[in-house]
Amino acid sequence: MSHTEYDKERQITNTKLFRDYIEKYLEHHPMVNNQLDIIITTSQQNEYGLTTRIYFFIKEKSWKKYEMIQSEIIDNILASATIFELNIFQRD
């Protein structure tokens, strides 16, 4: 069975694996403050797909560095979606 198929016995989907990946990535990222909450949520599916929200805190306080680190992390997460055969879509 491929990772994109639903495993009925263990209830694992590619979206669950993606959320788990994001959480582990953030937990081990040196600039993420893992002493504070890391939360990844997915809302109910609608005509646009699934909305995934990612909440985490960065150790850096300098605004410019903060923005650079956050952008790097989000870029990595977006690029990794294809590994899980997920497509990223942003609605205006």
Residue spans for each PLM region:
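Structured, soluble regulatory/oligomerization domains located on the cytosolic or IMS-facing side
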Residues: 1-92
